[in-house]
């Protein structure tokens, strides 16, 4: 008079990770004669899953594939027994570390709002035919703005009061560090990057 049940647990040795295309009761999808999971896996390994430093880890690969599949019925399975993610591949970082190290030069504190104006936008110049706004492009500000835009591309900086950095500059708004950017600001400040 007891309950029968099957224990479908898996036990992984330390350092082992398993990543599969789908659950046992699902079918792996194909797109144009190729497995969708395999296509996403290859894309992840080519750099799509790289972190800001160009490191590709199994966790990053899973996150990339999971995000890419979205709400589709196929769900990848990821099981791991690791205490840290070791890079399995390194690619060229989207933004060089030298740019990330500029965080503390651009922002005195992690919470600082960076004031922008049209002088930060290099196309706001009398040499380019279109409407220009004072203050005109300033070489020093343009250099800083390009750094800020690179940092925005990896999620470290965001415009305040505008959707795009261009309009934040042209409309004299501000930008700020994101929560992730604040974390890396502290790492740079502590000379850990």
Name the predicted role of every residue range:
Residues 1-193:
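Cysteine endopeptidase catalytic domains of the caspase/legumain-like
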């Amino acid at each position: 008079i007891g309950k029968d049940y099957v224990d479908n647990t898996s036990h992984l040795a330390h350092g082992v990770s398993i990543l599969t295309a789908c659950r046992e009761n699902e079918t792996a999808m194909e797109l144009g004669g190729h497995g969708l999971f395999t296509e996403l896996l290859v894309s992840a390994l080519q750099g799509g899953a790289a972190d800001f430093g160009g490191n590709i880890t199994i966790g990053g690969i899973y996150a990339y594939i999971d995000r890419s599949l979205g709400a589709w019925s196929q769900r990848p399975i990821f099981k791991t027994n690791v205490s840290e993610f070791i890079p399995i591949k390194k690619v060229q970082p989207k933004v060089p570390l030298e740019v990330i190290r500029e965080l503390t030069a651009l922002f005195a504190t992690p919470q600082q709002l960076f004031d922008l104006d049209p002088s930060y936008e290099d196309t706001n110049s009398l040499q380019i035919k279109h409407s220009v706004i004072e203050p005109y492009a300033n070489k020093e500000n343009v250099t800083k703005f390009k750094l800020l835009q690179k940092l925005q591309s990896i999620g470290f900086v965001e415009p305040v009061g505008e959707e795009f950095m261009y309009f934040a500059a042209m409309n004299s708004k501000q930008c700020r560090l994101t929560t992730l950017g604040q974390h890396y600001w502290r790492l740079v400040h502590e000379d850990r990057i």
